[in-house]
Amino acid sequence: MAELGHQVAVLDIDEGKVASLRDGNVPFYEKGMDESLNRHLREDNLRFSTELAEAIPGADFVFLCVPSQSAPDGSVDLRALRSAAEAIGPHLSPGAIVINKSTVPVGSTRTVHDLIGRDDIAVASNPEFLREGTALDDFMHPDRVVIGAETESQQQRVAELYQSLNAAFVLTDPATAELIKYVCNAYLATRLSFINDVAELCEGVGGDATDVMRAMGLDKRIGPHFLQPGPGWGGSCFPKDTTALTSIAQAVGTDFQLLQEVVDSNQRQFDRVADRARSMVDNVNGSRVAVWGLAFKAGTDDTRDSPALEVIRRLLSAGITVIGYDPKASFAADGFTQVDSEQAAAIDADLLIVLTEWPDFSTIDPSTIDASMRVPQVFDTRRVLDLDHWQAAGFTCEAIGQVAPNPDSSSTVDR
């Protein structure tokens, strides 16, 4: 919002986080965020506070951007949203619009309005569609801006906040706006699960998933996005949003079996990847596996519901020692050691697995890796390596969506 020229006050209950942001330090990794934060601090149009009385009074718009995690039963835990709504109510200026950015179930806009308890305050839904790793660019160049409010005048007031953006605007009612975010994420998860199942089919029939997906992507009805097979999907949104949408459907008596199968397919993908990795090491108990990538995707340090960690946990449960590297993310577990380079992870390893698609991994010279490994073999679950190059360097290579090579023709170098 500061990038769009607005005066912004940010409120958070975490004193340490607020202090860090005041000092110009972003407490997480996001491309471009450090520069943007410090520029707006210098321009004095962005400030941070832990006090309601400092941040809320006088604001024309108040955004609620609180966590919305899954409850044990699969529904959305609304405690943070409820607490925030109750807290801000007495401090809101007459005529202000409260805008919910959090991904929350249908009906939450009405819930927030009821908790605020004031007829002179409007509440709107304005879901975010930011991707970790490209969040700033996504905000400034959105595909669409979705605004759900009870009246056209409220919709227009919120839309004016984004008037400098070149984007399509979807002005609708709150319930529809709330549903849009869930449906979008559920569809993307569905697409990924489908592609991973197709990749397994390719392995079974001897096809190559890369060519299949490329041909699919050239079809204008399908397009090229979200057609890359991998170790599964995860992150801060897809798992909780697919679960939440299933819960929402059940609450209104809608049979959404397809979405449940999407979730189940993803769990099977974690198992398939781990099982294939285990089959590539001679002695499961006591083997040593190197892992490149811990974050749920490249461009972030976020490991929430990371497919990489799902696979790592399965390997650890099988008694395999795992040595991991990631340029931004970190992880800790019994039997797991994190090191500070790709080469360090590969030392004495029986297998190298690529689990996150960091671009730097594709530039690694395999000749700097093979001599240090106990068994030079690689399993590329993200299809980021030039496997012909790695094979020429003496590696046995396998990849998601590609039939495993015949052991008799393997290029493995005996050690």
Language-model segments: what does each one mean?
Residues 1-415:
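Structural/interface elements that position substrates and couple domains in central-metabolism enzymes
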